[in-house]
């Protein structure tokens, strides 16, 4: 039905005409065509009222356009954050104008809604009329009484704008007036959270997130490198004066800059926590290389246009041009950024000890703690428990990641602990998961990372995966990303030699068999010496015939870190993730940029109770959409990693797969920790620190109070595992307070840094040089060079050589013990045509150890004679067992994959870096590690004298040695002193020699010192194949009966009877194996045409 409207034509007399209903809405909207009111910010920055105090008032410069206006220094405080603002009275005027404008528009908007409702009640509008209940109260004109409270009277602002009075009293009156005005809007939470006040106070959604550090500078700036994004139509927030003169082209966009101690973040809006871009501060070059002038992170730029004011921020391989409103703001930004980048203790743009990006931690009571894990079983169980306790985010970085990996064994009852199931469960709970994996060259490696990425991405939308590098675009074909990291909530991280992939799970028993399958399902029953699977997609399908081939046991060491070192590791991950994202997915919104977290020290005016209160609000903050884990607290939300030990040290289902009847069967599990009095390091402890003297780090370490958390342990995680203490297991160490420093190998290609970092290499050399008595090394490779070696560049070998010569000249006992794999862990027999890579690596290792003028033993023999073995010796590991109940007895090397060095039982270096040029030079493979220096000492002995050993380092060595030597419970005291003859010669060397001889008698396995050429190897292989019918690629199958001659008679015996005399897994490294062969690739092998750098 049409509506009618009265019209008054010029001819006089009224007449009516009909108007269609659809015309009314447009008419109504045209009557109230005011600018829409800004919506009330749903994300509130302030949860409680901040405080602000005027600390000083300054008179304007003589050249000021308005000399009567004053500048005010305002000190603000919100919770544990303090910051200062310098505001002119004119800025107060603009703030007041903006608040009045907001109030006016809100009022108009409210009345517009009321008129619309009134018209609808008359049946004129689009919607049916609102029928009001007769009993309902009359709707007041102003339904929101808080709107009146949000208004700031103009009378409050006027004294601030122009304080009246005599010249002498203007400053006093102005200070009083400004304080009164601040009190008006600081007393109302709605006004404080308005966009106008938040901009005036220079705050945003990131300002008060404690995990990102203290509040520094924030403001609107202009950038042009970002793609176009949606912008507000409100021009009142324009930051650049030149905008009014149209000097900025369309490529420049206004963003909100947030400066934190470790980065500069760019946001679209203060109320939006989503990153548009981030500049993570990194070590700057010392000079520009031309005139020796130091390079700054931020520098002011000169522009021929006087209306443009800009500066440049350079970090890593990135350089961003930024504009500000005026020259004063540019100078303020430049000074603030450079100050933040060099602010102690981090000083991210200043290289620290060893040239590392990260500073030494634990010099004070900052919560730095570490815990070691020996072999994959212990480490994987701890990682699983940490993932299960994740609350906000998980970072995973690996050379190889297998989604189907079981982190707890036996695998059948632990399906929930499979990696993909663990991650899926946490992703469904809202935990954000970021996985960074190495993109291999498919022709060289068979790890199939594209399959891993596809499987991981299919878990849940909260799982993000990046593979890097893209080889063609980056030009990187020879080098890899080799780090192995798991970081949970920035609270605990795991670092070391273990990838989350097949073949790595193992225990101290190092079983060679598993038939029927109980512990190692499908392709996890892994022996790369025998065969590398062509595909990993059918993970539960066996690659090896279990009745014929042993698995290759895997020995590794991993470490958990808490406190500032954990966040330093996370910072490395963030740096690598952001660099990969910019190169591979710059415009993909589903792959976000990440922000590094910061160790924030509680200010002096706040106590431990305040810290606890902040921590209790973590859950509330996560609901608001910003992860505010209390990472500045020295108390982690995660408790100690559980000490996990299988209930049964023998076969878990009664099968005999991998059964050992040897000395290690009598161990009753790993050794028990020796109970010793623990003493913190104080200023009087005669401990030569493993630090550079110029850094002044030999400072007393603050003693930890009674609230130390060494005794806190997680509850049982699963019925098949029990929680123990450090006195009950030898595969998990005590959680220990210590000094820590994160070290790494990175360069431009791997992390986008402006210069090469080789701090792992520097740390190795420094530790060796400062060692007093003893160095213990376990590593996958041992390839290094002496001074003058132009081919192998790293100088770990040179440092060892010099230290040994010094000990010899000083006539002091000094021991270096090196444990490495017996053979490279690559496919192919020693004589196979396709095993040139195996032989090439053997060449470089023997070149380092014993062959040629560049080897350490050759040089030591030439200098000190046969006593060289008193100073340095080399070893490997080997295991044996039955492949099945009625199967043959087999042996395999225990593949040493750990990357550790322990010095004087007081310092330990653990990480992913091998001892070769690939890992140590920084410009090749990317690596990460941690140097741990003990601050908690225990009574021990060294060279026959009392010695204060470190709790972390000594317990790790004792665990490793008790496993390698097969020591029973109660025998640990025999190896307390690692350098005495009774330990080094009578136990360590004697055990290795005896075990090696027994393995030779039973198996004649390779490598050994009796086979000097490929021809001799062919003859031995042919003999054993003819005698046994089948053997392994390294002659690892024993005959059913051993034959020996006694008084002319042949005596036959069970090989297991002979093998019972073996203790542990330690064997001598065969120095004479293949000594008559040149093991380098030859012209008809493809490896001949590859760069030798690939192998060393």
From Swiss-Prot:
Residues 50-204 form the PX domain. It is found in: Cytoplasmic vesicle. It is an enzyme of class 3 (hydrolase). Its EC number is 3.1.4.4. GO terms for molecular function: phospholipase D activity. Does not require Ca(2+) or any other cation for activity. Residues 131-152, 607-691 are annotated as: Disordered. Keywords: Acetylation, Cytoplasmic vesicle, Hydrolase, Lipid degradation, Lipid metabolism, Repeat. The modification N-acetylalanine is found at residue 2. Induction: Transcriptionally regulated by GL2. Up-regulated by phosphate limitation. Optimum pH is 7.0. PROSITE patterns: PH_DOMAIN, PLD. It holds the Pfam family PLDc. GO terms for biological process: intracellular signal transduction; lipid biosynthetic process; lipid catabolic process; phosphatidic acid biosynthetic process; root development. Calcium-independent and PIP2-dependent. It catalyses: a 1,2-diacyl-sn-glycero-3-phosphocholine + H2O = a 1,2-diacyl-sn-glycero-3-phosphate + choline + H(+). SUPFAM superfamilies: PH domain-like, Phospholipase D/nuclease. One of its GO terms (cellular component) is cytoplasmic vesicle. Residues 234-342 form the PH domain. Residues 139-151, 607-632 have a biased composition (Basic and acidic residues). Hydrolyzes glycerol-phospholipids at the terminal phosphodiesteric bond to generate phosphatidic acids (PA). Phosphatidylcholine-selective. Regulates root-hair morphogenesis. Contributes to the supply of inorganic phosphorus for cell metabolism and diacylglycerol moieties for galactolipid synthesis in phosphorus-starved roots. Involved in root elongation during phosphate limitation. Belongs to the phospholipase D family. PXPH-PLD subfamily. This is Phospholipase D zeta 1. It comes from Arabidopsis thaliana. The lineage of its organism: Eukaryota, Viridiplantae, Streptophyta, Embryophyta, Tracheophyta. The gene is PLDZETA1.
């Amino acid at each position: 039905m049409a509506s009618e409207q009265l019209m008054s034509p010029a001819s006089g007399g009224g007449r009516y005409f009909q108007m269609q209903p659809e015309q009314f809405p447009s008419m109504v909207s045209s009557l109230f065509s005011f600018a829409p009111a800004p919506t009330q910010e749903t994300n509130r920055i302030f949860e409680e009222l901040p405080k602000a105090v005027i600390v000083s008032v300054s008179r304007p410069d003589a050249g000021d356009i308005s000399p009567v206006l004053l500048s005010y220094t305002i000190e603000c405080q919100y919770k544990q954050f303090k910051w200062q603002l310098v505001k002119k009275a004119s800025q107060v005027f603009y703030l007041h104008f903006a608040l009045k404008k907001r109030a006016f528009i809100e009022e108009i908007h409210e009345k517009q809604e009321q008129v619309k409702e009134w018209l609808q009640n008359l049946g004129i509008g689009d919607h049916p009329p609102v029928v009001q209940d007769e009993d309902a109260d009359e709707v007041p004109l102003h339904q929101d009484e808080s709107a009146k409270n949000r208004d700031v009277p103009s009378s409050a602002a006027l004294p601030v704008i122009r304080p009246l009075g005599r010249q002498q009293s203007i400053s006093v009156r102005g200070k009083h007036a400004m304080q009164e005005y601040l009190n008006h809007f600081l007393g109302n939470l709605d006004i404080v959270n308005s966009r106008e006040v938040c901009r005036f106070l220079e705050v945003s959604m990131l300002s008060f997130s404690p995990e990102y550090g203290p509040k520094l500078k924030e403001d609107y700036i202009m950038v042009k490198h970002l793609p176009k994004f949606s912008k507000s139509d409100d021009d009142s927030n324009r930051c650049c004066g030149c905008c009014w003169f149209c000097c900025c082209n369309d490529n420049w966009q206004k963003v909100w800059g947030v400066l934190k101690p470790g980065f500069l973040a760019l946001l679209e809006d203060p109320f939006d926590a989503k990153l548009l871009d981030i500049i993570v501060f990194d070590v700057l070059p010392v000079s520009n290389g031309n005139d020796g002038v130091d390079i700054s992170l931020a520098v002011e730029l000169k522009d021929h246009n006087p209306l443009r004011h800009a500066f440049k921020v350079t970090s890593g391989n990135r350089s961003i041009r930024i504009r500000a409103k005026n020259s004063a703001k540019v100078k303020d930004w430049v000074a603030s950024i450079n100050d933040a980048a060099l602010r102690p203790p981090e000083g991210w743009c200043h290289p620290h000890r060893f040239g590392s990006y990260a500073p030494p931690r634990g010099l004070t009571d900052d919560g730095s703690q570490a815990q070691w894990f020996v072999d994959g079983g212990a480490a994987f169980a701890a990682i699983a428990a940490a993932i299960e306790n994740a609350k906000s985010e998980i970072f995973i970085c690996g050379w190889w990641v297998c989604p189907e990996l079981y982190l707890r064994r036996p695998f059948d009852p632990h399906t929930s602990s499979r990696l993909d199931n663990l991650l899926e469960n946490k992703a469904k709970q809202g935990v954000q998961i970021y996985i960074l994996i190495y993109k291999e060259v498919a022709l060289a490696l068979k790890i199939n990372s594209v399959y891993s990425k596809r499987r991981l991405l299919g878990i849940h939308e909260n799982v993000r995966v990046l593979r890097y590098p893209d080889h063609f675009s980056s030009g990187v074909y020879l080098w890899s990303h080799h780090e192995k990291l798991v970081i949970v909530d920035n609270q605990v991280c795991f670092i070391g030699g273990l990838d989350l992939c097949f073949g790595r799970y193992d225990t101290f028993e190092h079983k060679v068999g598993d038939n029927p399958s109980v512990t190692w399902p499908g392709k996890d029953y892994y022996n790369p010496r025998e065969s590398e699977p062509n595909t990993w997609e059918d993970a539960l399908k066996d690659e090896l015939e279990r009745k014929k081939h042993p698995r290759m046991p895997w020995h590794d060491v991993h470490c958990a870190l808490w406190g500032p070192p954990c966040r330093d590791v996370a910072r490395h991950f963030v740096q690598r993730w952001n660099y990969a994202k910019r190169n591979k997915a710059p415009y993909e919104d589903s792959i976000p940029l990440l922000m590094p977290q910061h160790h924030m020290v509680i200010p002096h005016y706040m106590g431990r109770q305040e810290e606890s209160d902040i921590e209790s609000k973590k859950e509330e903050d996560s609901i608001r959409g910003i992860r505010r884990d209390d990472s500045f607290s020295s108390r982690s939300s995660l408790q100690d990693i559980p000490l996990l030990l299988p209930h049964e040290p023998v076969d878990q289902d009664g099968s005999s797969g991998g059964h050992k009847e040897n000395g290690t069967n009598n161990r009753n599990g790993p050794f028990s920790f020796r109970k010793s009095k623990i003493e913190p390091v104080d200023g009087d402890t005669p401990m030569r620190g493993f630090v550079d003297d110029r850094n002044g780090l030999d400072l007393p370490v603050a003693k930890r109070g009674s609230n130390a958390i060494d005794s806190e342990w997680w509850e049982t995680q699963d019925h098949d595992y029990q929680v123990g203490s450090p006195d009950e297991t030898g595969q998990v160490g005590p959680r220990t307070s210590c000094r820590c420093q994160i070290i790494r190998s990175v360069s431009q290609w791997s992390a986008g840094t402006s210069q090469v970092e080789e701090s792992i290499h520097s740390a190795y050399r420094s530790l060796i040089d400062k060692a007093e008595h003893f160095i213990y090394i376990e590593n996958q490779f041992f390839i290094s060079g002496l001074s003058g070696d132009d081919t192998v560049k790293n100088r770990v070998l040179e440092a060892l050589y010099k230290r040994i010569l010094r000990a010899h000249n000083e006539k002091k006992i000094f021991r270096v013990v090196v444990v490495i794999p017996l053979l490279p862990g690559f496919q192919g027999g020693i004589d196979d045509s396709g095993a040139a890579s195996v032989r090439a690596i053997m060449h470089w290792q023997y070149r380092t150890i014993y062959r040629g003028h560049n080897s350490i033993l050759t040089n030591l023999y030439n200098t000190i004679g046969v006593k060289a073995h008193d100073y340095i010796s080399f070893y490997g590991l080997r295991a044996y067992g039955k492949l099945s109940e009625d199967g043959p007895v087999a042996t395999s090397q225990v593949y040493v994959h750990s990357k550790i060095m322990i010095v004087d039982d007081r310092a330990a270096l653990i990480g992913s870096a091998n001892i070769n040029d690939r890992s140590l030079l920084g410009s090749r493979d990317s690596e990460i590690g941690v140097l741990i220096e003990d601050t908690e000492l225990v009574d021990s002995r060294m060279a026959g004298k009392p010695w204060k050993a470190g709790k972390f380092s000594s317990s790790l060595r004792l665990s490793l040695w008790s496993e390698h030597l097969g020591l029973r419970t109660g025998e640990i005291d025999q190896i307390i002193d690692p350098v005495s003859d009774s330990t080094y010669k009578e136990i360590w060397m004697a055990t290795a020699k005896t075990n090696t001889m027994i393995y030779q008698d039973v198996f004649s396995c390779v490598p050994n010192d009796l086979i000097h050429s490929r021809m001799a190897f062919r003859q031995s292989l042919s003999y054993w194949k003819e005698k046994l019918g089948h053997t392994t690629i390294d002659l690892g199958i024993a005959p059913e009966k051993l034959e020996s001659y006694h008084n002319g008679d042949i005596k036959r015996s069970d090989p297991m009877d002979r093998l019972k005399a073996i203790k542990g897994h330690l064997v001598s490294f065969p120095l004479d194996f293949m000594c008559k062969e040149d093991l380098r690739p030859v012209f008809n092998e493809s490896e001949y045409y590859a760069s030798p750098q690939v192998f060393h």
